[in-house]
Amino acid sequence: MTAAKDRILELRAELDQHNYRYHVLDEPSIPDAEYDRLFHELKALEAANPELITSDSPTQRVGSVALTAFTQVRHEVPMLSLGNAFEETDMREFDRRVTEGLDLPAGDLFGGGAAVEYSCEPKLDGLAVSLLYQDGVLVRGATRGDGTTGEDISVNVRTVRNIPLKLHGTGWPATLEVRGEVFMSKAGFERLNASQLEVGGKTFANPRNAAAGSLRQLDSKITANRPLEFCCYGIGQVSHDISDTHIGNLQQLKAWGMPISHELKLAKGIGECLDYYRDIGERRNSLAYEIDGVVFKVNSIADQRELGFRAREPRWAIAHKFPAMEELTELLDVEFQVGRTGAVTPVARLKPVKVAGVTVANATLHNMDEVARLGLMIGDTVIIRRAGDVIPQVVQVVMERRPEDARPVQIPESCPVCGSHVERTQLVKRSKGKETISEGAVYRCVGRLACGAQLKQAIIHFVSRRAMDIEGLGDKSVEQLVDEGLVSSPADLYALKFEDIVDLEGFAEVSSNKLLAAIEDSKKPGLARFIYALGIPDVGEETAKVLARSLGSLERVQQALPQVLTYLPDIGLEVAHEIHSFFEDAHNRQVITELLGHGLQIQDQGELGAEFAASTTLGGFLDKLHIPSVGPGGAQKLADKFESLEGVMNADWLDMRQALPEKQANSVREFFALPEHRQLAEDAEKQLRDFGMHWQSEKKVVEGLPLAGETWVLTGKVELMSRDVAKEHLESLGAKVAGSVSAKTHCVVAGPGAGSKLTKANELGVKVMDEEAFIAFLKGHGISA
């Protein structure tokens, strides 16, 4: 027993220290796997010795038996709200009141008085909580409630990973009440909503609602699985003073294991407070969490006591609020727009309202599933949210304000742009040899490029900088070309003549010639760039690069079957089906043929990528057929036993049972009993042979890209090609292209106007190549400029 107890105490101390370094200092000291090993060792020891379990053990964060209701608790020191400032003059008036209250020399509304020291920190948008520690051990957690009475949420706060169950170090007061905010980061909020959607659970309108809803769960096991965090901002009741300043208090709390704001600062005078407010405001959208303002507090504890309180707020603190990110308004109508892939999506037309300082009259509704989830009707009062550069969105309906004449939102039967039929396509999730119909659906206009909206968006994407990079073709120019009937597919761009465009609005002789030259210059795209330009659903730049690097040629990309495509990194079966379906479409194949007929020469084509070609084994192939109940291990057993696809498909029952348990053996025989499954497997195997990547083939591959493992940097102007094209060429040779120079940089390509990067390269002794040498280098590797 003594050995077990000693080891338990040792593990708890070690895990507490690792938690502190990870959650408070942001300095993890061991890998996650090692932490998990220590945690599971402690859990096993406590399970074997339940009498040694204590409330402050790290294992007690997982949640306990669900409650039927929360009990009420009284705050010994009331949790008061703060006064608000909305304008700069409000802040200057607050500072004037503080200086007068402290009998300091006063200035006017624009300064001139004594410089009071203030603590500054962001006002987190979460749920205020009180944590009570007795002799360093967490004994109670409570909500703010009405400031005097809150709810006991002790079992839930124990599940928040960065709240210490026992304080670190020594010297803490016998009674210490820590106050702070429980919140959810933006990334955690997105993950939670995504997981809720997957299981058909409730989604949340914003991180604050998610945090509040999670913390007030009667079942603490649910809370334990939510990505909640805590940030300390002060103290309540305490048996003796900690420091003579507010910031001193927080720094000591941090030493005892409490997480505090990384943005905590000291400001001298109101001017520095306003500078801090502006700085945080500018960085607000890049912060990992949501804030709704900045809190300023007189830093001196003695001065705080002298200033005291008025009504239900302290005289020594104020919250300088940012413009609200959410507002109420009326949904006037729902209109429908058509995107590049034909998806018909709803857009909310709103009674104009100011949100975060910007007038909003339209908001995204994403799709009809979202309309149904919100229960949205035309005429509803809705909550609009706008955060940073994110398109405003409707996040909630205020049901109690729904008018009697509210109308349902209905998808149009015909395309609002071209009049073609709108079809409903059920979303399909493919896994383990079967197709699962999900609840979601997408509505598409069947008009394709005959639909002006789809055509315009397809052309805009095709000519964009990261696609074919045709300079001089902005959105308005594309709309003109389509509206004038000059362009009805991407291939038509390469048939344009001077006389076609010179008389168009915004064009003249010089701009027309420049455009034609830009179109001509785009005729030698890299394979990845060309694939991306085609606008294949779910294929972004990175997936296009994977396709190009792995398959090596446009022909193989066009021919690849879904089962073959899933060998590629980060391409699952659903994306593989999208790619295959795109190239199966006769119209898409015709557009590609026409593009090549206009003289496009796809660059960077060659053999299969070595990593891709080497990835094929019979076991892996069988696994990718997604035979029900047969995972990677079972697939490998089949490969070891039968050594060929034909052997597996034609195996008798006894041989199959020698390889697999009865259930799996039955599943394999039932799978290959279906002619369509046999055909699918045979077609995929044949394609692997045709591509030269069959497990029995002698593989012709790019064994090692010449620049594999090297880091290159581009600086200055590359005159014979765009920087993006130069980057593509280097990546096609295996290089990583970085944005800064370090001792690990292999080479810097320096064109005219190269600056600090060239200087640093010379200082570090990094190889430097001018543009002429770079072009020659590319030609030496079969790439023309």
Swiss-Prot record:
UniProt-listed GO biological process terms: DNA repair; DNA replication
Annotated catalytic residues: 123
Record field: transmembrane: none
Reaction equations catalysed: NAD(+) + (deoxyribonucleotide)n-3'-hydroxyl + 5'-phospho-(deoxyribonucleotide)m = (deoxyribonucleotide)n+m + AMP + beta-nicotinamide D-nucleotide
InterPro entries assigned to the protein according to its UniProt record, in alphabetical order: BRCT_dom (IPR001357), BRCT_dom_sf (IPR036420), DisA/LigA_HHH (IPR041663), DNA_ligase (IPR001679), DNA_ligase_AS (IPR018239), DNA_ligase_CS (IPR033136), DNAligase_adenylation (IPR013839), DNAligase_N (IPR013840)
Ribosomal protein as UniProt keyword: no
Cofactors named for this entry: Mg(2+); Mn(2+)
Entry similarity comment: Belongs to the NAD-dependent DNA ligase family. LigA subfamily.
Official protein name in the record: DNA ligase
Species lineage: Bacteria, Pseudomonadati, Pseudomonadota, Gammaproteobacteria, Pseudomonadales
Gene expressing this chain: ligA
